[in-house]
């Protein structure tokens, strides 16, 4: 579309025709070229808008994404067991163990505890506590019971600075503190596990020894009976061997005694016979008698050569 239709035609009039489509096409090409190669400020604007640049698969994470977010822990802090007692006389009903709160208590006006407002609501309603504390503050300031120093106006700046930090970086600070706390807890748990490693190994060894002792107790009567039988058999064999040795010794002694006795008797008998024979030979009458008889017998023999 051109501007020629919007202008009246005259003799001395000049009409300038501008091709709108070509201008639009030129601006479109310039914008496309700018998107392909954005400058520094365009990149910065894309970063704040969360628009991914060319070549990025995902949109960039904005630095203000965690602003005004409330952090909550994925799991609560470990609590003390209810049956835990450091001493049997500890009264857990009247004096329980103090529990570490995970989150700060409920507050109003960013710093006033909610427990200060609750008692007034039963009598004055919801607005009563605010009027009371506001009037008390005005009374103390008016009567100069609460005197501001020269730097008192700086409190407003510190409050604004606190709100700015907590609303912008409070989520990341809480998350970092929680992760650091978990790492510290895991570190101390590792130390405790290392200290109790020997106790755990001793417990396992004791359990195995207990099982072995129970199995030994079950088979102990049979083993004791077999052991006693072996001991009795060994003692019996030893006694039998002792009896056999003693009996053999006594038999050998009797045998040697009888042999010695027989030998002595034989020697005495031979000695007696020899002495009697020698005595007879020494007698002349016996010698002559038998000698003559022997000579006659020899003569009567017919010797043949």
From Swiss-Prot:
Consequence of gene loss (knockout): RNAi-mediated knockdown results in either embryonic lethality or arrest at the L2 to L3 larval stages. RNAi-mediated knockdown results in a delay in somatic development. RNAi-mediated knockdown does not cause sterility.
MF GO annotations: proton transmembrane transporter activity
SUPFAM superfamilies, alphabetized: ATP synthase B chain-like (SSF161060)
Pfam families: Mt_ATP-synt_B
GO biological process: proton motive force-driven ATP synthesis
Keyword Ubl conjugation found: no
Transit peptide limits: 1-22
Ribonucleoprotein among keywords: no
Gene Ontology CC annotations of this record: mitochondrial inner membrane; proton-transporting ATP synthase complex
Source superkingdom: Eukaryota
Keyword annotations of the record: CF(0), Hydrogen ion transport, Ion transport, Membrane, Mitochondrion, Mitochondrion inner membrane, Transit peptide, Transport
Principal subcellular localization: mitochondrion
Location of the protein in the cell: Mitochondrion; Mitochondrion inner membrane
Similarity comment: Belongs to the eukaryotic ATPase B chain family.
Assembly mode: Subunit of the F-type ATPase which has 2 components, CF(1) - the catalytic core - and CF(0) - the membrane proton channel.
Protein purpose: Mitochondrial membrane ATP synthase (F(1)F(0) ATP synthase or Complex V) produces ATP from ADP in the presence of a proton gradient across the membrane which is generated by electron transport complexes of the respiratory chain. F-type ATPases consist of two structural domains, F(1) - containing the extramembraneous catalytic core, and F(0) - containing the membrane proton channel, linked together by a central stalk and a peripheral stalk. During catalysis, ATP synthesis in the catalytic domain of F(1) is coupled via a rotary mechanism of the central stalk subunits to proton translocation.
Name of the protein: ATP synthase F(0) complex subunit B2, mitochondrial
Organism: Caenorhabditis elegans
Lineage: Eukaryota, Metazoa, Ecdysozoa, Nematoda, Chromadorea
